């Protein structure tokens, strides 16, 4: 599926037509950038993780999920919507999973520098809008640090977007999130029913349901004992995954189905496409200069 974010091209030009351009940054040719309507184009940087996800899921879960959400969004993007998806940054910030074999992680300062330098390269191409699309809960704070710095230094319009916070409704507006219990939404935060369902929809051959179970979280124990410490909002534990469950997973993975996962992916894809459309419609004065009173 192509996009239309070209300026008017000269007559008899060998440059591609708007509809012929791909959606992925790396698939463009260098001369294409000379005719991009860079003031409208939205660059999307997917950031994920390579980390353990219990005994039943592969290390690539977060990377697979963010790319699956993008794929689900593509059919809902208008050809008039100028969006370019940058290469997925698969390795992220995952120190909370380092006690489990296979986890790859970078230091916080490395991640900040990496994402910042990629954004600087995007800005050097003339693009003025950037979305940091994240699928890993352990690096949410780093997105905000990078986004605010880019706004302050480069004047970029930057949005931090976490795929797991996108609205979850079907085409009729009914809740897709209701497939899962409130308990699962709160405590099944890693390799539980939600992520396992999505992986069954995307890469079923990599899911070992024989090893999936209802993985208990010690977070539930604290919630039952402490009214403030356990409310999930007032205080945040600096945790390692084994603090929650020795298997490195929490939530009822045994209840996962591909059907639930497909519905989630479609809902996230629709929401992402709508979000990008809304960013495109923002007024030019969304970012403003300071003025003296």
Q: Which sequence ranges carry the predicted segments?
A:
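Conserved SAM-binding loop
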Residues: 132
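Extended, histidine- and acidic-residue-enriched regions that form the cofactor-binding/catalytic faces
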Residues: 6-129, 137-293
């Amino acid at each position: 599926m192509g996009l239309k974010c070209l300026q008017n091209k000269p007559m008899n030009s060998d440059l591609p037509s708007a509809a012929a351009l791909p959606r992925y940054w790396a698939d463009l040719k260098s001369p294409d950038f000379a005719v991009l309507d860079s003031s409208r184009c939205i660059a999307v940087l997917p950031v994920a993780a390579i980390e353990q996800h219990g005994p039943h899921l592969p290390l690539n879960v977060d990377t697979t999920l963010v790319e699956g959400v993008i794929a689900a969004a593509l059919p809902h993007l208008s050809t008039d919507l100028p969006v370019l998806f940058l290469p997925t940054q698969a390795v992220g910030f995952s120190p909370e999973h380092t006690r489990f074999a296979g986890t790859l992680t970078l230091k916080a300062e490395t991640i900040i520098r990496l994402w910042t330098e990629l954004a600087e390269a995007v800005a050097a191409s003339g693009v003025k809008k950037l979305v940091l699309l994240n699928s890993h809960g352990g690096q949410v704070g780093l997105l905000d640090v990078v986004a605010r710095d880019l706004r302050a230094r480069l004047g970029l319009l930057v949005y931090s977007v976490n795929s797991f916070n996108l609205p979850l409704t079907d085409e009729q507006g009914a809740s897709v999130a209701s497939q899962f219990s409130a308990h699962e939404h709160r405590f099944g935060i890693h390799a539980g029913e939600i992520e396992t369902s999505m992986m069954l929809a995307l890469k079923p051959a990599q899911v070992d349901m024989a090893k999936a179970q209802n993985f208990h979280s010690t977070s539930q124990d604290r919630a039952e004992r402490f009214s403030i410490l356990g409310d999930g909002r007032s205080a945040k534990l600096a945790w390692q995954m084994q603090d929650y469950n020795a298997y490195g997973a929490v939530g009822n993975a045994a209840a996962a189905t591909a059907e639930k996962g497909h519905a989630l992916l479609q809902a996230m894809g629709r929401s992402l496409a709508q979000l990008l459309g809304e960013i495109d419609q923002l007024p030019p004065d969304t970012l403003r200069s300071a003025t003296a009173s």
